C-alpha cells in the first residue's frame, strides 16, 4: 500500500509551529507527513509501520523530506524548517551526496541551507558514533543545523549529544506533559538545561498541551516549545500564534 501511495503522490506535508516561549513568536515549523484523509494511512504512525513492513524506510524518508522542502520553497517561506531524518538514512544521504551535493540539493527546492534543521530520529541505533559525528560536521559546513529528537525517551544517549553538539535538542513529551503537577519533571528539565548550557544547545519542549504546562516551562526559561496548545499541524505554516498562548 505505501509503495502505491508514494507512486500516486498521495502523501502530503503539514507544518506545526515551534514557538519562542519568551517572545510568543514563531521560531520555526516542523514538517510532518500525512496520508490520504479518511484512510488508515492518514496518521503518520501507520505510514511508518507500513514503511517498516514493506522495507521502504529509505524511500519513505526521502519522499517525506522532498515533499516538505518542495512545498516550503513553493510557498516562498523565509523561516526555518525542521525535517525528520533517521540516523541511518542520514548516513546514506551524505554518502551519496556529500557536503556540496547536499547544498545543491537543498537549493534546488528554493530553500537556503541555513533555513533547514535536520531533526535526527532513531539515533539510539547508531553503531558508529564517530562516523555520525563526522557527518554532523559536514552537514554544519553546508550551513544546515542539527537537532536531536525526543531526547530523554529512554534510548537517547548523552554521549551522542556531546559528540554531535546539535544546535537544538527536543525534550521528549514525557517530561513536559503535566509538568505543572510533577516536581520531579521540573528537576529533570533543570538538569537538561545545565547540560544544554555546557554544550551551547537550545532546548525545545515538545508536547505542550495546557496553559499550566506552558507557564511552568516558560518560567523555567525553556527557549522554545511545540504542542497542540501552541499550534496544531496545518496545511499552511502559521504566521503568528493564537492569543491564548
Regions found by a protein language model. Name each.
Residues 10-12, 28-30, 80-84, 115-119, ...:
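Structural preference for beta-strand elements that scaffold enzyme active sites
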Residues 14-49:
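A short, well-structured catalytic beta-strand-centered motif of the EAL phosphodiesterase domain
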Residues 50-55, 88, 174-177:
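A short, internal acetyl-CoA/4′-phosphopantetheine-binding micro-motif in the GNAT/acyltransferase core
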Residues 58-131:
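Catalytic core of bacterial c-di-GMP phosphodiesterases, primarily the EAL and HD-GYP domains
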Residues 107, 133-145, 190-197, 218:
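Surface-exposed amphipathic alpha-helices with a cationic face
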Amino acid at each position: 500500500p505505501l509503495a502505491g501511495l508514494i507512486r500516486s503522490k498521495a502523501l502530503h506535508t503539514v507544518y506545526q509551529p515551534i514557538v519562542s516561549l519568551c517572545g510568543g513568536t514563531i521560531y520555526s515549523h516542523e514538517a510532518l507527513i500525512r496520508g490520504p484523509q479518511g484512510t488508515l494511512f492518514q496518521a503518520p504512525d501507520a505510514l511508518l509501520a507500513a514503511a517498516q513492513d514493506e522495507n521502504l524506510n529509505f524511500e519513505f524518508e526521502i519522499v517525506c523530506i522532498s515533499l516538505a522542502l518542495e512545498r516550503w520553497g513553493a510557498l516562498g517561506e523565509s523561516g526555518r524548517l525542521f525535517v525528520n531524518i533517521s540516523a541511518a538514512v542520514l548516513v546514506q544521504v551524505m554518502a551519496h551526496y556529500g557536503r556540496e551535493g547536499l547544498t545543491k540539493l537543498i537549493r534546488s527546492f528554493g530553500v537556503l541551507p541555513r533555513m533547514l534543521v535536520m531533526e535526527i530520529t532513531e539515533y539510539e541505533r547508531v553503531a558508529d558514533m564517530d562516523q555520525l559525528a563526522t557527518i554532523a560536521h559536514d552537514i554544519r559546513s553546508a550551513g544546515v543545523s542539527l537537532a536531536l529528537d525526543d531526547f530523554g525517551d529512554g534510548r537517547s544517549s548523552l554521549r551522542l549529544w556531546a559528540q554531535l553538539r546539535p544546535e537544538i535538542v527536543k525534550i521528549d513529551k514525557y517530561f513536559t506533559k503535566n509538568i505543572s503537577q510533577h516536581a520531579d519533571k521540573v528537576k529533570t528539565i533543570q538538569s537538561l538545561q545545565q547540560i544544554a548550557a555546557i554544550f551551547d544547545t537550545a532546548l525545545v519542549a515538545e508536547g505542550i498541551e495546557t496553559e499550566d504546562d506552558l507557564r511552568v516551562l516558560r518560567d523555567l526559561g525553556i527557549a522554545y516549545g511545540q504542542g497542540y496548545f501552541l499550534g496544531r499541524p496545518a496545511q499552511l505554516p502559521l504566521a503568528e500564534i493564537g492569543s491564548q498562548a
